[in-house]
């Protein structure tokens, strides 16, 4: 279960079937796989770090958690499209936008990478 009002940042890494969806939320909400955002995580994903720093300037007290979705092969693109259409207040990194374009068929799957 993902509550859209808690989704702060959406990012993707890797490509094609190996795409990983990284979701940063403002609450854990019954999710055992959600872990607190750490410096190591931010160092690994610099695009997420830029958005995260912007959010922390707005609300320094807020604790953020992240979850990485690795399973699901190409179904992750459908999931990403659903997140994009329902979580309108979330920040999306440029990599996530490119993956959403693939999900919507605006970019041919073979053109990327």
Language-model segments: residues:
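Terminal and domain-flanking low-complexity segments
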Residues: 39-113
């Amino acid at each position: 279960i993902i509550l859209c009002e808690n989704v702060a940042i959406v990012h993707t890494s890797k490509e094609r079937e190996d795409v990983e969806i990284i979701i940063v939320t403002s609450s854990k909400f019954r999710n055992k796989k959600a872990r607190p955002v750490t410096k190591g995580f931010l160092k690994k994903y610099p695009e997420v770090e830029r958005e995260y720093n912007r959010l922390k300037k707005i609300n320094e007290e807020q604790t953020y958690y992240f979850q990485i979705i690795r399973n699901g092969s190409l179904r992750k693109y459908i999931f990403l499209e659903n997140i994009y259409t329902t979580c309108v207040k979330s920040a999306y990194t440029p990599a996530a936008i490119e993956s959403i374009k693939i999900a919507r068929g605006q970019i041919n799957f073979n053109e990327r990478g």
